Amino acid sequence: AGGNEKLKSRPVVVGCGPAGLFCAYFLAEYGYQPVLLEQGAPVEERQKDVEEFWKTGVLKPDSNVQFGEGGAGTFSDGKLNTLIKDPVGRNRKVLEIFVENGAPKDILYVNKPHIGTDILRTVIRNMREKILVWGGEIHFHTQMTEVLFTENTRRIRGIVYEDLLKKEKEEIQTETLVLAPGHSARETFAMLFEKKVPMEAKSSVSYTHLTLPTIA
């Protein structure tokens, strides 16, 4: 409720592209110990699978140039761009976090910031390690299959996820869920539609400055 109520359970973030990764990063930094679920592979595994694809043409659906930790831009040339107008300095904060995790300092002041593919993968790995050090939890090859609601108030009470390697399902209790599934999320949107979760297309983005309290 606007940051005024103490969380009863750990927040869950679905998707480890830029939105999900940074969301989990901030939550972990402020002591909320998020659980981050990613359907694809960690960046090291992605790199091996991508190299194998270029050599053999064998494509792994959940681990490739477009899919996995870091999102679709991980194997781009590392150019940084945003079309979001940001009066409160969040774009600058993103660049600072990149630098803190291994990106070159010149991205803070050059007109067209550029990290480079190899460095970008290192940055993503370093961000992941910090999330873990700060008490977060990350599950790769894991797909959210259901959102659970309370019967009367229709408030989120948890999710069900499947370990895609073990083919096992588990339930997590949470009242805070952030969905950042990126592309190839048809099953997620279909499930939300069946659950009668209100959805709308993005129109414009406006920011309100929020200050998160540090958990003792």
Tell me what each language-model feature is:
Residues 20:
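N-terminal Rossmann-fold NAD(P) dinucleotide-binding loop
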Residues 32-50:
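Glycine-rich FAD pyrophosphate-binding loop
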Residues 14, 172-182:
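Short hydrophobic core segments
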Residues 140-153:
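A conserved short coil-to-beta-strand element within the FAD-binding core of flavoproteins
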Residues 45, 51-137, 142-143:
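Conserved N-terminal/central alpha/beta ligand/cofactor-binding core
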Residues 7-16:
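Beta1/beta-strand and adjacent pyrophosphate-binding region of the FAD-binding site
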Residues 179, 184-194:
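Flavin (primarily FAD) binding-site architecture
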Residues 208-214:
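Conserved small/polar residues in nucleotide/adenosyl-binding loops
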